[in-house]
From Swiss-Prot:
It comes from the Bacteria. The keyword Oxidoreductase does not apply. It comes from Rhodopseudomonas palustris (strain BisB18). Pfam families: TACO1_YebC_N (PF20772), Transcrip_reg (PF01709). GO terms for biological process: regulation of DNA-templated transcription. GO terms for molecular function: DNA binding. GO terms for cellular component: cytosol. It is found in: Cytoplasm. The keyword Cytoplasm applies. Residues 1-21 are annotated as: Disordered. Its main location: cytoplasm. This is Probable transcriptional regulatory protein RPC_4807. InterPro entries: Integrase-like_N (IPR017856), TACO1_YebC-like_2nd/3rd_dom (IPR048300), TACO1_YebC_N (IPR049083), Transcrip_reg_TACO1-like (IPR002876), Transcrip_reg_TACO1-like_dom3 (IPR026564), YebC-like (IPR029072).
């Protein structure tokens, strides 16, 4: 399994683990509120807010919930969330990045540190593992919107760095600086993307045995279940058999 596939599997597990829609909607709403508060409540003028709304729509979040989250940012009585990135090493020395939005820094740090420690890993300082990842933009489209060749041609013309096409869809990667422009150009050609967001893409992935892989997947599950955690990224590869066993 390639590192790219591992990234997809982690996201798939996130969807499975967040089967409780109330928890998932809460996380999506939090990102929408923060994005609207940091920028403008108009998604046409706020790329981060637009990305958050796209993610919410993909999970069938009701329109009323989305609008309520935006209005919450405009009001003066809404919660204030801090954006925090945690970095550390999981079992087997695998690099892990955790993105969180929290209204209690001490609680979040304590919880996340305990998850790493209990799994046999350790939470490090900011910057301790980020150098092993590239901060990049990802734009996803359904496979039916274009052939692999047409998507590749359009992506190159738009200034993208890489394209991965399969039966499950097209994934276009672009630098952090050009991401918004690439997404806009492709959406003008193919319609709204099913995902458009900044991500941490591992530069290389580390193969791990099933025992270590199981510990890592359990750590990721714990992290993703935490109310404050928005995204988890890691640079490891596991066997398809283990993913099937763990329900990924």
């Amino acid at each position: 399994m390639a590192g790219h596939s591992q990234f997809k599997n982690i996201m798939h597990r996130k969807g499975r683990q967040d089967a409780q829609k109330s928890k998932l909607f809460s996380k999506l709403a939090r990102e929408i509120t923060v994005a609207a508060k940091l920028g403008t409540p108009d998604p046409a003028m706020n790329a981060r807010l637009r990305s958050a709304i796209i993610a919410a729509r993909q999970e069938n979040m009701p329109k009323d919930n989305i609008e309520r989250a935006i209005k919450k940012a405009i009001g003066s009585d809404g919660e204030n969330y801090d954006e925090i990135r945690y970095e550390g090493y999981g079992p087997g020395g695998v690099a892990v990045i955790v993105e969180a939005l929290t209204d209690n820094r001490n609680r979040a740090a304590s919880d996340i540190r305990s998850y790493f420690t209990k799994s046999g890993g350790n939470l490090g300082e900011t910057g301790s593992v980020a150098f092993m990842f590239d901060r990049t933009g990802i734009i996803e489209f359904d496979a039916k919107v274009a052939s692999a060749d047409d998507m590749l041609d359009a992506a190159i013309e738009a200034g993208a760095d890489d394209v991965l096409s399969s039966d499950s869809g097209h994934e276009v990667y672009a630098s952090q600086d050009s991401f918004r422009e690439v997404a806009k150009a492709l959406e003008q050609k193919f319609g709204e993307a099913r995902k458009a967001a900044l991500t941490w893409k591992p530069q290389n992935t580390v193969p791990v045995d099933d025992e270590t892989g199981e510990k890592l997947l359990k750590l990721i599950d714990l992290l993703q279940e935490h109310d404050d955690v928005q995204n988890v990224y890691a640079n490891f590869e596991v066997s398809d058999a283990l993913m099937a066993k763990m329900g990924g």
